[in-house]
């Protein structure tokens, strides 16, 4: 038997910028790869070790299976020994499918659906009364409970309010031995049967039996049982009991609301799925939202009059002598609407009439023509209804796009955003419907499920389901996601949240002997929750797995059993292992990471905080999601950090309320801002630029050079060469987006997409151009010995040397280098970029544009994927923006960014419903003094350990005296 390998050995790894790297990693340990951005960490972890694990797995499959998976390219290395089965957990969005939620991703929703289907209590969705189902024995017991001396009839319904004589049904019942009927409420004997009017509706019951309970309480159980069973058979599972001289009762073997006389289908797990026709709301098809015409987009400027174009789609018709304009004028005359009064000053009823129409009320219309006049009556449709009707009816793609500018997603009015049909929403467990429980946070949902008070039979059914739900929710809590709700849409999750959800799922699988490769699992996690994440990673290791983490977070590095530090620089200056060993030995190492960990290098804390321009942007009464009437002042001309534990409301405040509200006020943005009262101080700002982590493109044609417009200048340089002018080539010849210079086999992509049908599509290099994108004729043209394909293959740092004398190319390249992307290749396809890299490319593009000094920049966790030294460069870039008079708002957990900010807004105190308030605000020093702030607690220690800057920042105006941080509520 071969000896068991206790190490994973990699020799001669040369993928991307790796320089024949060799490492020996201990198995069953927590191993961290760290180093500057672009130094080769991911190239070894993902593109070599994980990729080879996947390739070997595919090679182990049958030839039949491999034909569907295609040939996976072998990474460049000499040999790898001791490789375990590999599982990758990356920072990718969980799903772009709007039907995907936290509950469906984690499978918790599947177990909840089973729970509601098996022990849920059905209520009538119309009257709210409990809906019950009774067996024949239970019906007999109900009848036995009637008072002594009660006389009653048992009846089965033959006809329920239908036209006709129905003689055939009556004859069939007579033939079966029944002698009495109840016709339209009157009990008649066989010889008294009337002739029914076939043009009228009738209700006919057959009398199954006439029964009585003795004065002494004697109950003829055997006879009643036979009659009940007969009646249920005759009445298709329903039986009426008419108390003589009293009321009537309906018993049913199926679910039935007696008050509304309505049946309900038997609940199944599919009845509670918004992805199944059996459960989804019929109006929104289970999405919970519908596109509707948005009044705020239709009337973007309420200071205008109707005649002056307040209603934007009607702006032109109001100025001309048009048919629509004439109708609006007639409506205005009929209802006394002043078309020359500002929209905001019109009475609410007049605004409602113009938007939603006359709601069926007819208006006399008159139109005069040269040949006479036309008179008629019609109701007024209203602008919103008219636009939506035309949007649904048009066949023109151009008109559809025009109408879509006035559409926004609105909560479905039928299901109120709950996604399920009314009958499904009326089933409760523990007094709550499934949508109500799905709206709880993970922590609250777990408490609810475990706290259910169930009967013995229900407990027996639910115990195993409760265990599964408890386990899954527990794992999510352990990775710091307790603030998420189960109905949170998958597309709204950040890359870090998605990664931790997948991590929680792997904990639940309890696999052993696996190599897990993780990409920065600490992204988006507050310092307070780091310990729980590290405990989860250790638990994964303790199952007998090897956990390999690519990480920059100080706590994660210090918790590692073994650390591999890459460097010394990025791109071609990296690709080497500069240290491999324990954390203690790394602190003594001369590498960049070692010097930052030991404190020999540090990002200094500014000696003074910028006071800003003296003007503020004030957001009042923000109430979106979990925000609790938050009002906040943002000093303009400063670097503002918005902080708080995960789920405290940071992204909601900035991305869901502030950014869209400012965009709408400044640029007429179409995104609907979250609920708030007012945004003041907009006049001090001229632009809002959101720099998020969404991809810069979704195809291989999109890359850093094209996005930043650097490639436009590069193409001009190639077009000016002697060879290009000789061949008559212009800049378009060097574009891979148009015919001429590109390879037509792949249409300039450099790769061909292979559709895998039931798997993700696979991209393979083009066989004609071998991934170079251009045809041979184009590649004849060279600049400084390089063709255009070779230029696109250059890292930014090398491109700076090549184009050192090209003033049109240099600015874009410099900004890419300044934001820490010097290692990126100019033509690196956008699908291969991380969220953090995409965000910094967007930042670089904005930096290369002229600044006005009155712009608000919004960044969401810009430190994603940044090493300590790259973070220092990023802070320098942000300082440049602020020093030019702009305002930078960052949502951030990284303590180095927070302590370097001029102003901090800390939300909390916890996540979910326990958050949504401002806990502290002010300078980092002021926030650090607030006892109730989790951020302040960690910030105190960070400020204590940090070194002050040698050169203090100069405020643009005298700084105000320090004020006490506001501990709760909102700023006044």
Residues covered by each model-derived region:
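Conserved phosphate-binding elements of NTP-dependent enzyme cores
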Residues: 1-972
């Amino acid at each position: 038997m071969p000896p068991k390998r206790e190490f994973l050995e990699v020799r001669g790894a040369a993928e991307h910028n790796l320089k024949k790297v060799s490492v020996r990693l201990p198995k069953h340990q927590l191993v961290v790869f760290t180093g500057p951005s672009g130094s080769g960490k991911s190239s070894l972890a993902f593109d070599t070790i994980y990729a080879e694990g996947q390739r070997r797995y595919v090679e182990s499959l049958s030839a039949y299976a491999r034909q569907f998976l295609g040939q996976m390219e072998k990474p460049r290395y000499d040999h790898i020994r001791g490789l375990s089965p590999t599982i990758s957990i990356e920072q990718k969005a969980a799903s772009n499918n709007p039907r995907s939620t936290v509950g469906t991703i984690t499978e918790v929703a599947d177990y909840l659906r089973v729970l509601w289907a098996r022990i849920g209590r059905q209520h009538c969705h119309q009257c709210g009364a409990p809906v019950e189902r009774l067996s024949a024995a239970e019906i007999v017991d109900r009848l036995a409970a009637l008072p002594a001396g009660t006389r009653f009839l048992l009846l089965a319904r033959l006809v329920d309010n239908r036209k006709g004589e129905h003689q055939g049904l009556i004859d069939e019942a007579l033939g079966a031995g029944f002698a009495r009927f109840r016709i339209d409420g009157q009990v008649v004997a066989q010889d008294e049967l009337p002739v029914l009017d076939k043009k009228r509706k009738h209700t006919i019951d057959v009398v199954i039996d006439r029964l009585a309970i003795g004065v002494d309480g004697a109950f003829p159980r055997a006879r009643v049982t036979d009659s009940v069973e007969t009646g249920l058979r005759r009445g298709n599972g329903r039986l009426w009991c008419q108390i003589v001289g009293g009321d009537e009762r309906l018993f049913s073997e199926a679910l039935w609301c007696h008050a509304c006389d309505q049946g309900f289908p038997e609940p199944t797990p599919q009845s509670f799925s918004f992805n199944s026709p059996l459960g989804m709301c019929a109006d929104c098809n289970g999405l919970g939202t519908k596109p509707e015409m948005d009044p705020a987009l239709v009337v973007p400027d309420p200071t205008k009059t109707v005649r002056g174009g307040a209603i934007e789609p009607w702006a032109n018709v109001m100025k001309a002598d048009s048919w629509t304009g004439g109708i609006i004028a007639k409506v205005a005359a009929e209802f006394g609407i002043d078309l020359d009064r500002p929209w905001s000053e019109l009475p609410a009823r007049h605004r409602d009439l113009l938007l939603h129409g006359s709601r069926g009320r007819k208006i006399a219309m008159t139109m005069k023509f040269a040949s006479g006049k036309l008179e008629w009556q019609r109701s007024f449709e209203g602008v919103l209804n008219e636009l939506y009707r035309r949007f649904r009816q048009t066949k023109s793609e151009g008109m559809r796009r025009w109408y879509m500018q006035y559409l926004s997603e609105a909560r479905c009015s039928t299901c109120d955003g709950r996604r399920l049909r009314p009958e499904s929403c009326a089933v409760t467990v523990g007094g709550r419907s499934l949508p109500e429980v799905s709206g709880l946070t993970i922590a609250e949902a777990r408490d609810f499920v475990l706290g259910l008070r169930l009967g013995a039979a229900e407990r027996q059914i639910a115990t195993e389901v409760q265990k599964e739900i408890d386990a899954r929710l527990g794992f999510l809590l352990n990775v710091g996601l307790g603030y998420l709700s189960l109905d949170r849409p998958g597309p709204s999750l950040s890359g870090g949240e998605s990664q931790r959800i997948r991590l929680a799922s792997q904990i639940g699988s309890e696999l052993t002997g696996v190599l897990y490769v993780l990409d920065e699992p600490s992204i988006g996690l507050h310092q307070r929750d780091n310990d729980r994440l590290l405990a989860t990673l250790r638990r994964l290791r303790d199952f007998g797995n090897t956990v390999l983490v690519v990480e920059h977070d100080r706590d994660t590095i210090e918790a590692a059993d073994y650390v591999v530090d890459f460097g010394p620089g990025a791109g071609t200056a990296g690709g080497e292992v500069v240290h491999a060993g324990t954390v203690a030995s790394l602190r003594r190492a001369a590498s960049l990471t070692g010097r930052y960990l030991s404190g020999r290098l540090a990002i200094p804390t500014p000696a003074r905080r910028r006071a800003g321009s003296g003007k503020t942007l004030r957001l009042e009464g923000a109430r979106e999601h979990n925000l609790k009437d938050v009002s906040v002042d943002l000093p303009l001309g400063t670097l503002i950090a918005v902080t708080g534990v995960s789920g405290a409301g940071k992204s909601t405040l900035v991305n869901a309320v502030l950014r869209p509200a400012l965009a709408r006020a400044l640029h007429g943005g179409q995104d609907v801002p979250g609920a708030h009262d007012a945004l003041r101080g907009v006049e001090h700002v001229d632009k809002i630029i959101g720099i998020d982590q969404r991809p810069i493109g979704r195809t291989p044609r999109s890359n850093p050079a094209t996005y930043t417009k650097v490639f436009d200048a590069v193409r001009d340089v190639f077009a000016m060469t002697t060879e290009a002018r000789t061949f008559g080539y212009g800049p378009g010849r060097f574009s891979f987006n148009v015919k001429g210079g590109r390879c037509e086999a792949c249409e300039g992509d450099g790769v061909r997409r292979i559709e895998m049908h039931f798997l993700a599509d696979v991209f393979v290099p083009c066989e004609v151009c071998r991934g170079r994108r251009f045809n041979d004729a184009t590649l004849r043209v060279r600049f400084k010995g390089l063709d255009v394909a070779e230029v696109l293959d250059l890292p930014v740092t090398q491109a700076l040397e090549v184009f050192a004398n090209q003033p049109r190319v240099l600015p874009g390249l410099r900004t890419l280098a300044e934001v820490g992307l010097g290692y990126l290749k100019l033509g690196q396809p956008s699908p291969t970029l991380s969220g953090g890299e995409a965000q910094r490319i967007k930042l670089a593009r904005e930096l290369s544009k002229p600044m006005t000094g009155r712009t608000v920049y919004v960044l969401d966790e810009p430190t994603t994927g940044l090493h300590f030294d790259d973070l220092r460069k990023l802070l320098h870039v942000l300082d440049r923006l602020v020093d030019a008079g702009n305002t930078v708002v960052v949502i951030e957990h990284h303590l180095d960014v927070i302590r370097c900010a001029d102003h901090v807004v800390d939300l909390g105190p916890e996540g979910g419903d326990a958050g949504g308030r401002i806990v502290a605000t002010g300078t980092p020093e002021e926030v650090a003094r607030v006892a109730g702030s989790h951020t302040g607690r960690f910030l105190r220690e960070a400020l204590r350990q940090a070194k002050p800057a040698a050169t203090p920042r100069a405020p643009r105006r005298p700084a105000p005296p320090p004020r006490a941080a506001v501990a709760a509520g909102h700023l006044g």
